[in-house]
């Protein structure tokens, strides 16, 4: 896989596919980025290219605008933050239309000098970006490719998507992987190939079905698999426990029984949970044993004893991978489990990886220092699919 060091970019236009898909607070007059982690992660690649005299054209998606312009998903607010982090102006090439690489964008890009940068409008304003029709996708890839002479893939969070800007454009231009993609791959290889032991994995989130592939891939490799979040209730049901009104995938119970039989004592489930009479921050709550959830009550977090149990299992780990919150951390009464696990991972002396998505958001929301972890991934789904051993379209396109 080529790197940006292999490209002679001085004086040339370089299309960089970054991942600037950040959350925006739109409650005020001006949209405000609430978590700029992905913007910051994109800077090393862009800065390196600019320092070498490239004329950089940054592209990204934001949210799911359904293939047509939607002002609330505009990347314009991100251009300002990117300029602050780069320490130089960023020309925004959007004009409010879905013509992402049209006349206005071409004019902005043509006006770039060496060491200057522009940001295209949200790629997903164009139906061709995510189209299942290869011809439609190819036509949009042709438009994007016409803007540049080189392509750099640096959107690790999107490499599992067969989208035009991720998988089709690199077939049309000399290409390389960006700094972020290379860093993410190095980290994931450490997790999947001969990790230092003991190796503990913490999985949370809502559904077993969403994590089944990674569970099956990692279970033979780990010393402990700690299961929290909504998915733990299907495992508890597989043990014969009632789970009240908690999230339950009945179709996955038999699968969980098989996993429990395979994993034995290496699969660690909560011993207590925080339950509520309804899904609300002001609900009545209680801490109950994991096998004594009252009928109609919802399990919304792991309990304090479970948090201590998980922390103890993490304390001596040489390698830790954490993906998925332990509860509904966005609501204060159900955040303690996620905070406790995050703090335990952060306090460990081994190699610790936070697996993107909601886990990364939880770290920042709860105010835990990011530098306490060895790595916070920008790719939730991409990280999991890599660990499952799947072929990721965006990586396959760069590796030729």
Curated annotation (Swiss-Prot):
<keyword id="KW-0067">ATP-binding</keyword>
<dbReference type="GO" id="GO:0006096">
    <property type="term" value="P:glycolytic process"/>
</dbReference>
<feature type="binding site">
    <location>
        <position position="330"/>
    </location>
    <ligand>
        <name>ATP</name>
    </ligand>
</feature>
<dbReference type="InterPro" id="IPR015911">
    <property type="entry name" value="Phosphoglycerate_kinase_CS"/>
</dbReference>
<comment type="similarity">
    <text>Belongs to the phosphoglycerate kinase family.</text>
</comment>
<feature type="binding site">
    <location>
        <position position="211"/>
    </location>
    <ligand>
        <name>ATP</name>
    </ligand>
</feature>
<feature type="binding site">
    <location>
        <position position="299"/>
    </location>
    <ligand>
        <name>ATP</name>
    </ligand>
</feature>
<feature type="binding site">
    <location>
        <begin position="19"/>
        <end position="21"/>
    </location>
    <ligand>
        <name>substrate</name>
    </ligand>
</feature>
<dbReference type="GO" id="GO:0004618">
    <property type="term" value="F:phosphoglycerate kinase activity"/>
</dbReference>
<dbReference type="Pfam" id="PF00162">
    <property type="entry name" value="PGK"/>
</dbReference>
<keyword id="KW-0963">Cytoplasm</keyword>
<dbReference type="GO" id="GO:0006094">
    <property type="term" value="P:gluconeogenesis"/>
</dbReference>
<keyword id="KW-0547">Nucleotide-binding</keyword>
<dbReference type="GO" id="GO:0043531">
    <property type="term" value="F:ADP binding"/>
</dbReference>
<feature type="binding site">
    <location>
        <begin position="61"/>
        <end position="64"/>
    </location>
    <ligand>
        <name>substrate</name>
    </ligand>
</feature>
<feature type="binding site">
    <location>
        <position position="124"/>
    </location>
    <ligand>
        <name>substrate</name>
    </ligand>
</feature>
<keyword id="KW-0324">Glycolysis</keyword>
<dbReference type="InterPro" id="IPR001576">
    <property type="entry name" value="Phosphoglycerate_kinase"/>
</dbReference>
<comment type="subunit">
    <text>Monomer.</text>
</comment>
<feature type="binding site">
    <location>
        <position position="38"/>
    </location>
    <ligand>
        <name>substrate</name>
    </ligand>
</feature>
<dbReference type="InterPro" id="IPR015824">
    <property type="entry name" value="Phosphoglycerate_kinase_N"/>
</dbReference>
<keyword id="KW-0808">Transferase</keyword>
<protein>
    <recommendedName>
        <fullName>Phosphoglycerate kinase</fullName>
        <ecNumber>2.7.2.3</ecNumber>
    </recommendedName>
</protein>
<dbReference type="GO" id="GO:0005524">
    <property type="term" value="F:ATP binding"/>
</dbReference>
<comment type="pathway">
    <text>Carbohydrate degradation; glycolysis; pyruvate from D-glyceraldehyde 3-phosphate: step 2/5.</text>
</comment>
<dbReference type="GO" id="GO:0005829">
    <property type="term" value="C:cytosol"/>
</dbReference>
<feature type="binding site">
    <location>
        <position position="161"/>
    </location>
    <ligand>
        <name>substrate</name>
    </ligand>
</feature>
<feature type="binding site">
    <location>
        <begin position="356"/>
        <end position="359"/>
    </location>
    <ligand>
        <name>ATP</name>
    </ligand>
</feature>
<keyword id="KW-0418">Kinase</keyword>
<dbReference type="InterPro" id="IPR036043">
    <property type="entry name" value="Phosphoglycerate_kinase_sf"/>
</dbReference>
